[in-house]
A protein has these predicted regions:
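Sequence-structural signature of the catalytic-core scaffold of metal-dependent phosphohydrolases
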Residues: 2-42, 50, 54-65, 85, ...
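A short small-residue
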Residues: 65-75, 368-373
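Low-complexity, highly charged intrinsically disordered N-terminal segments
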Residues: 78-81
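Hydrophobic (often cysteine-bearing) scaffold residues that line and stabilize catalytic clefts
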Residues: 83, 131, 135, 153, ...
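A residue-level signal for conserved active-site and pocket-lining positions in enzyme catalytic cores
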Residues: 157, 390, 429
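C-terminal subdomains that position terminal phosphate/3'-OH groups for nucleotidyl transfer/ligation
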Residues: 280-420, 439
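C-terminal amphipathic alpha-helical interaction region
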Residues: 402, 407-449, 453-454
């Protein structure tokens, strides 16, 4: 679901941020670093991007980062890694449906579109910190209140692939040089940029989401990405497809996980029990103001989404994890996904940001997820503890920076002032998996002994 730009029709420097456009640049497949492509390499530049992402440290860490339900709870639940893989599969499916509908006229190099969307999907969650939404909120609140800075998962993903991931390094006139992250092509970087405006613009416009931090390294790469003119920054078609795939994967698959875990009372939702409808509608009012005129509208959406289950035996009572119930749940989620894929590619064109019926469906499904998986009262203690871990890790590393990795890089920012020092620490904490963050916190504060690395 696309975020509203900081001001109507504006991006980081005054361009149109809400307009998605095809990738029309002479050097769309250029990289910032020196390219030494092997002559016998059969891969396209975007396929090279995809392979670099898959083999990266940040991608591997997604296997131990929370999607919705904590990775430590049970192995069945999706992690950020499995969500990312499923998102990439849906992105390719949407791309192929559009190309089958003779959509080539609006896409440069249509033969690369599925690979480009897949690469964007694979990279889109690399910047998410430990503990899912709770970790992201904790880091953002900490930065806002203490230093007037921000944390945002999408901007962190951009920072990882353009700076932090140890893959490519550019030698400059100085002996230090500059890390280039994965050194991805312009095409892939543009496709992954869901919010083409900066941290400063987001703060000024009181907008939650943004795509790039306000520091010299990130801004320089962002300017290069748009041929030296960041005012041209805008969403791309591949980026819109990636967002559609992400929202569908998130909305449908987390409903499946929550139902299987018996956290979401699917039978009560199917039966439109008043208490369940009220909780969903109240959450939807808060997270999607103005989308629904009344709670009756939310109930109508629930009836449209779950009405087919009224006559299903497995959904008439609490989920029992029988093979029959598991098959019924899987069939329902598959049908829901197929329906959304059909709607998003209806008429042979991408129907996403302006597809109000589909956006309302997504909003209701996400509201269910927030009610029972993200903000349930039963998880208040766990979320409090996770926020505390995040805050105390940041404080501990700032107090004793000798515990940080990359000490040669820390030496260059140690006396540079709070913004650079703090961002360095945040980069490290955000890179941690759930389990590693908890382990380091225990050792840092003397509640456990041992050694580990990641």
């Amino acid at each position: 679901m696309m975020a509203t730009p900081p001001s109507s029709g504006s991006n980081a420097n005054g361009g149109n941020a809400a307009t998605s456009a095809p990738q029309h640049a002479v050097d769309a497949y250029a990289r910032m670093g020196v390219s030494r492509r092997k002559p016998d390499d059969p891969r396209s530049p975007v396929e090279v991007d995809r392979d670099r992402i898959v083999h990266s440290h940040a991608f591997r860490r997604l296997q131990r980062k929370t999607q919705i339900v904590g990775v430590h709870s049970i192995d069945f639940f999706r992690t950020r890694l499995t969500h990312t893989i499923e998102c990439a599969q849906l992105g390719r499916a949407i791309s192929k449906r559009l190309l089958d509908g003779s959509w080539e006229q609006v896409v440069e190099a249509p033969e690369h579109l599925p690979d480009l969307v897949e690469a964007a999907c694979l990279v889109h969650d690399l910047g998410h910190p430990p503990f899912g939404h709770t970790g992201e909120e904790a880091l953002d609140e900490l930065l806002r209140t203490r230093w007037g800075m921000r944390f945002e998962g999408n901007a962190q993903s951009f920072r990882i692939v353009t700076l932090l991931e140890p893959k490519k390094y550019q030698r400059l006139e100085s002996p230090v040089g500059r890390p280039l992250g994965l050194d991805l092509t312009r095409a892939t970087l543009r496709a992954m940029t869901k919010y083409p405006w900066t941290e400063r613009t987001a703060i000024a416009g009181d907008v939650a989401k943004f795509g790039v931090y306000d520091n010299a390294d990130d801004q320089a790469y962002f300017d290069w990405l748009w041929d030296g003119d960041a005012s041209r920054a805008q969403r791309t078609i591949a980026g819109d497809i990636m967002e559609a795939a992400d929202d569908i994967a998130y909305a449908v698959h987390d409903i499946e996980d929550g139902t299987w875990a018996r956290l979401i009372p699917i039978d009560q939702i199917v039966q439109l029990e008043p208490w369940a409808v009220e909780r969903i509608a109240t959450l939807a009012d808060r997270r999607y103001p103005g989308m629904f005129a009344s709670h009756a509208d939310v109930e109508a959406e629930l009836r449209a989404l779950f009405g087919t289950l009224v006559s299903s035996d497995w959904a008439r009572g609490p989920f029992d994890r029988s093979r029959r119930s598991e098959g019924g749940l899987k069939s329902f989620c598959s049908a829901l996904t197929d329906d959304m894929l059909r709607r998003v590619t209806e008429g042979g064109t991408l129907c996403w940001n302006d597809n109000e019926p589909l956006q309302r469906h997504i909003a209701v499904l996400k509201s269910i997820i927030w009610v029972w998986l993200i903000e349930p009262p039963e998880l208040v203690t766990r979320r409090y503890g996770q926020r505390r871990i995040i805050r105390q890790l940041v404080d501990g590393f700032l107090d004793e920076p000798g515990m940080l990795p990359y000490q040669d890089e820390w030496a260059r920012v140690a006396d540079a002032g709070d913004p650079q020092r703090v961002r360095f620490v945040i980069d490290h904490v955000a890179s941690m998996t759930d389990t590693y963050a908890a382990m380091v916190h225990r050792e840092m504060y003397g509640t456990a002994m041992g050694a580990g690395w990641e």
